[in-house]
Amino acid sequence: MKRLYWSHISMVRKCPLRYLWYKGHPDHDLGAGLGKPKPLAFEERPSEHFKLMGSVLSKVVEVMYNDRLLEKPKDCLSKLTEVAQQEFEKLEQTHHIMWTYLTREEAMKICLDGVRNFLEIVKDHRMISKSYAQSELSMTPQINKSLKVCGIADLVYRDLDGKLWILDGKNASTPMKYEDEDQLRWYALCFRLEYGVLPDKLGFFYFRYPKSNPPKKNPDPSSEWTGLVEVSLTEDDIRRLGNEAIETHRIIERGVFEANPVPKNCSFCEFENICEARQEQKRLNAAKRKPKEPKEYDNYKTFTLGSGKL
């Protein structure tokens, strides 16, 4: 039985060809054998420092909730700081990192600050439970006879008022600029199919920006920044994503993947430099731009050189 994750949906939405190159397909040999992803030369591989930091902070959330550290709140900061340091040192051995965008020390600081900020968000929003809390919750329900829709939620918990939440933590520097709210709705779809109920609340929380350190640009200027952004959910969202899952599976099974170059998406794609469609688009865009006209100088004007005049 085939499995479909949110990352599959998101990639096929934005660019089917990137999905093919990133995931591979049994009908295609992209240079490494049938079914294998397209290989990239070492110099073309993007740095995974953002992925590294995100994985470290996800581990922090997982340990805090699954190991029930909230039962001893005084020890949380020291234990989670240790978890972050150890996870960082472990993962940097397996990730392709180029310390050019930021230094190793800066990345470590972002993670350690993220621990402290996360605890502040937990306190401010009372993200505690006396009945149910699970981090890295894996869901793999069937949506039809041939397909499972899958998701791994950062945090699912029932709050002290009885409301069921699904939350996703983000290490983004610009909240809600690149997040897709359908990611959380996808997890809600998976949860409904797995457990028979919809969550009451969905939201993103931001490791860099607790209430005490708001971002420069609040995605909702009409309200105070709190470190958590709620996302709406309706039955129509669930039906829409269920239908999209089935259609996306059909597209993948058909095995025809066309490029869909869009600059804002291509800028995050590791294959941008080798994608013919994107390079052709860039050439056409460059040709449309008017060439800069050379500046003409009036020989009779006065030019200033240093403190003297000619």
Map each language-model feature to its residues.
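Metal-dependent nuclease catalytic regions and adjoining charged, substrate-binding loops involved
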Residues: E179, F191-L310
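Residue-level recognition of the N-termini of beta-strands and the immediately preceding loop/turn
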Residues: S131, L164, P199-L202
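Charged, glycine/proline-rich intrinsically disordered loops and linkers
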Residues: D27-R45, F88-H96, D113-R116, N213-T226
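Nuclease catalytic cores
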Residues: K2, W6-L69, F268-F271
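Short, well-ordered amphipathic alpha-helices
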Residues: R116-L119, Y187-R192
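A non-catalytic, helix-rich entry segment at domain boundaries
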Residues: V56-L137
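Non-catalytic protein-protein interaction segments used by genome-maintenance enzymes to assemble
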Residues: Q134-W186
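Hydrophobic (often cysteine-bearing) scaffold residues that line and stabilize catalytic clefts
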Residues: H49, M53, A107, C111, ...
